[in-house]
Amino acid sequence: PLYSSAASDVYKRQIDGRIGFIGGMNIADRYVRGTQWGTWRDTHFRIEGSGAAGLQASFLSDWSATTKTHISGPEYYPPVGHFTDDILQIAPSGPFGKWRALLQADSYAIARARQRIWIQTPYYLPSEVLNTALQEAALAGIDVHLMLPARSDSKVVDLATHSYLDDMMKAGVKISFYKPGFLHSKLLIIDDMLSVIGSANMDFRSFEHNFEINAFVYDREFASRMAAIFEDDLTHCHTVTPGEWFTRPRTRRVAESLMRVFSPLL
């Protein structure tokens, strides 16, 4: 079909069931050549050990659902070595069933934050629950920082995304726009302990309609490394002030409000 409401945006790769890759990267020329307006910035990780088995299980589950062919056996789940003591959860999510695993997990993590919530996402079209949770965290004095591309691959999505930022900024959320190109990274850092990396954007489609997969890593050293990546990207950003944001043209704000209506479909 030309369009499906149950799209698959799962960016995971498997090698012999022993090594897995997870993050936002597609297999595409744009990662080498960039875009007309700059580089394509993404975050992707290699996983070895039991975490790779989790990716393998998710892949085989998707394969079974797609082809109606069940694949199992020890050859698909080879013995894996022990590499670190990091606690890692592989969390797939899809449009079937009552619960939305990634939305619930992110909302729970945000509600438990005490120091910082740092987010990188190419699109910000959140559910009301998630949007409110981030604003409440900022109002409680938590360092909430949202990093977005200055320009994404969709002008309509940019307009809809910006319609959510007024209330975020009023609540004290810091908003930075990545300037060198398209920021496609999907990263969530909670305090100095939890990092979330994967395929899911902060938007309706990822949480409600798409097949997605994220890795939840519970480790201080790893969180520190992710924070360093965030801070390095921040040197290539423009952090917007309220004075700048609230003086943008009225016609622009009207267009943003109109596009917001279509957020669940974008």
Question: What feature does the model see in each segment?
Answer:
Residues 12, 18-20, 116, 143-145, ...:
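Beta-sheet entry/capping signal
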Residues 93, 119-121, 148, 178, ...:
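Thr-Gly-centered strand-to-loop micro-motif
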Residues 154-202:
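C-terminal structural cap/anchor segments
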